[in-house]
Design a protein with these regions (language model features):
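A short, N-terminal "cap"/entry segment at the start of jelly-roll beta-barrel domains
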Residues: 1-63
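Short acidic-glycine-tyrosine-enriched beta hairpin
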Residues: 87-105
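Short histidine-centered beta-strand/loop micro-motifs
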Residues: 40, 60-67, 84-85, 92-93, ...
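Structural motif
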Residues: 79-81, 99, 118
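A generic "binding-loop/recognition-motif" signal
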Residues: 68, 107, 115
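Short, conserved beta-strand element in jelly-roll/cupin
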Residues: 67-82, 86, 122
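Double-stranded beta-helix
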Residues: 2-18, 26, 110-133
Length: 133
C-alpha cells in the first residue's frame, strides 16, 4: 500500500518543492535555510526541479546560468526587466504585473527590478554558475 501524504497549503516562499524524477513532490525548507545548505546538498537537490517563490525590490546581485535545463520565471506582481545573454546579443524582456519568461539552458541571465516584485521560479539547478552583475 502506498503511503498517504497529508495535503495542506504551502507558502512557496518558505517551503520549496523538489519535483523528483520518480514523480514525487518533496517539500523542503526554503529561503535562507535552503540557500545556506552545503554546496554538495544544493547540488544534489539541483538534480530535481526546484519550485520556489521570492520577493525582491532590488536588482539581482549576480548573473546566473543553468546548464542542465531551461528555467521558468513567472512574475506574479511588480515590474522587472530580464536580461538574457544570447549568442546573437543581449535580449531584454520587460514584464509588468504578470508574465512568464523562459530562460533557455546555458544562457546567462539576471533581472533589473523596477518595482517591488514577487517571482515564482521552476529551476533545475545542478551545475548552476554565478558571476557578479
Amino acid at each position: 500500500m502506498l503511503g498517504m501524504r497529508t495535503v495542506q497549503p504551502l507558502d512557496p516562499s518558505l517551503i520549496y518543492l523538489l519535483l523528483r524524477s520518480n514523480g514525487d513532490a518533496q517539500p523542503i525548507q526554503g529561503g535562507d535555510a535552503f540557500w545556506s545548505m552545503p554546496k554538495t546538498e544544493l547540488e544534489q537537490h539541483g538534480q530535481s526541479w526546484l519550485v520556489s517563490e521570492f520577493s525582491c525590490s532590488k536588482n539581482w546581485p549576480s548573473w546566473e546560468m543553468h546548464p542542465i535545463a531551461d528555467e521558468l520565471i513567472y512574475l506574479l506582481s511588480g515590474e522587472a526587466e530580464f536580461l538574457l545573454e544570447k549568442p546573437e546579443g543581449l535580449q531584454r524582456i520587460h514584464v509588468v504585473e504578470s508574465g512568464l519568461v523562459i530562460v533557455p539552458r546555458g544562457i546567462w541571465h539576471t533581472a533589473q527590478v523596477s518595482a517591488p516584485s514577487r517571482m515564482f521560479l521552476i529551476t533545475m539547478g545542478a551545475g548552476t554558475q554565478h558571476r557578479p552583475a
